[in-house]
Amino acid sequence: MCYIMDKVGILKSDRIEQTTLLVNQNKIEFMRQSMDNIKFMRMDLSSYLITPGYVMLDFSLHSLLPFQDFKQQIIRYLKKGCTSLLTVVDIKYEKELVSNVKKRRHLMINSPIDYFMAVKLSLKSLNQSVLRKCKQQQVSIVFVEINKDDRLDLTSWGWIRDAMFSNPITLIPFTSDESLSPFKKNRLLQEWNRIVREHRISSLYEFLEEGTPLSKEILMKLGIYPVKGDIRVGNKLNYNLYKLEELKYHIDGKPIIQHNEISPTFTSHNGKLININGNILFLPGKGEECFISISGRFIPQSASF
């Protein structure tokens, strides 16, 4: 079925512009400023701001989670406008990787939204073998836990880089050391960044926050954008709608969306409304696992390392 999302506000170059979307078979077929000459059913969205469906990070899910607990945790994300989840599997020993990833995939069969798989392991567990197993399991995101006592310079980074060659794997620094002051945490991150840049390893240069939308820049680096995290022709219909009158604005007119204070009025996943004013439609099994074919897409080569 074709219909038109008419005159919805979209953020472009730090300001809101009105655009009109032609939707066909739950995909965006056409976008332009107006489509007054096209005769299809219209939805007047002139009082709304549209954003892409959010991709969010989660460390809390685990394979032994009962369905009702799993459902409640996922609903928290749906209320925030999340339409794709980056779920992280904790790996203590390399031999656990295959079985733990398999268990997480079994848990996510019930997911109502799309999801990407990632693993988290300690620095001492990071080696060529574990990265090859990640490739075999089609896992392209690896969180590396680093703490104050870790000696980053003692890791065989040259071997790590060789194992990542031609693999769409991105390393992400992570720390759970609560004893670290913000200053020491920043020093630890600086040391990580120095090492991965020196060895030209595909990595993020910041710690990521759970339960908040991942930025466009992060999604680009991971290889998730533009399939997710963008409103563009050809993409599936994953979006959030916010009432313009409920938003706060910067002096320059750019809207402020504080995700801990305001939730989207509507959320669509693949063309199906799953959030209407906080009322959640939980459809088990409607989500699909997504895979990353190329990391760092649409990033200039000079900015990749």
Regions picked out by a protein language model, each given a short descriptive name:
Residues 11-20, 45-57, 74, 154-173, ...:
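Short, charged N-terminal helix-start/capping segments
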Residues 1-37, 57, 61-64, 70-86, ...:
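Active-site microenvironment of metallo-dependent hydrolases
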